[in-house]
């Protein structure tokens, strides 16, 4: 049975991560210790009651791919929907795209609980967060507007497409390439042997 270490996480946020200083940054004024405690308590409840119970069942009845259809472990789809609807996917994402705009310090503590409760389930949110981060860092305004709200809302998810047959996960040996097309899309050439949360 998973029990989230809320007091320990709050201690780390206050004493080590400097949450009180972060709350002085413009835009984060409402993200002090009181807000962090309330958010962490709710995250603990969600992870203990919804995410952790799927850990064992996910190992027993794992996801599959058959006839071109991907099936997740029982309960994962519903749990991810609840995660998105509860605002957990957008916790540290900008409000302009549907996120809550909280500091990453709070987001990281909540993610720590999800990872500890069920690593397999957490990968979907982690990879979706990575896709959002990549778009925020390097995406055009058009791409951000098109993709980020759907990722935050749980309509779409991110994946990791790294492992290639000739390279494993050695990026220097990966041969997959993307060629721009005239309509603004890209055509991919290459192979992948594992796609995390594909």
Residue ranges: model-predicted function:
Residues 92, 100, 142-198:
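Glycine-rich, Trp-frequent "lid" loop and neighboring beta-strands that shape
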Residues 123-141, 168:
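N-terminal glycine-rich flavin-associated loop
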Residues 66-75, 137, 154-159:
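Short, mixed-charge aromatic SLiMs
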Residues 18-19, 116, 133-141, 153, ...:
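Short, well-ordered loop/turn and helix-capping segments at boundaries between secondary-structure elements
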Residues 1-123, 142, 146:
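Amphipathic, small/basic residue-rich leader segments at the start of a protein or domain
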Residues 64, 128-131, 153, 164-166:
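A glycine-rich phosphate-binding loop feature that marks nucleotide/adenosyl-phosphate handling sites
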């Amino acid at each position: 049975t998973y029990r989230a270490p809320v007091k320990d996480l709050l201690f780390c946020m206050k004493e080590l991560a400097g949450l009180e200083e972060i709350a002085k940054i413009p835009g984060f004024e409402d993200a002090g210790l009181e807000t962090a405690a309330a958010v962490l308590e709710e995250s603990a409840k969600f992870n203990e009651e919804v995410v952790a119970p799927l850990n064992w069942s996910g190992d027993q009845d794992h996801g599959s791919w058959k006839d071109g259809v991907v099936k997740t472990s029982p309960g994962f789809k519903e749990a991810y929907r609840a995660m998105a609807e509860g605002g957990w996917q957008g916790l540290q994402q900008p409000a302009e795209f549907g996120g809550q705009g909280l500091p990453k310090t709070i987001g990281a503590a909540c993610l720590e609980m999800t990872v500890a409760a069920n690593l397999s389930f957490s990968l979907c949110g982690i990879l979706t967060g990575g896709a959002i981060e990549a778009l925020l860092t390097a995406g055009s305004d058009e791409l951000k507007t098109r993709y980020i709200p759907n990722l935050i809302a749980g309509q779409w998810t991110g994946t990791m497409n790294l492992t290639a047959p000739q390279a494993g996960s050695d990026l220097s040996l990966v041969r997959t390439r993307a060629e721009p097309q005239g309509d603004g899309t890209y055509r991919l050439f290459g192979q992948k042997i594992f796609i995390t949360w594909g």
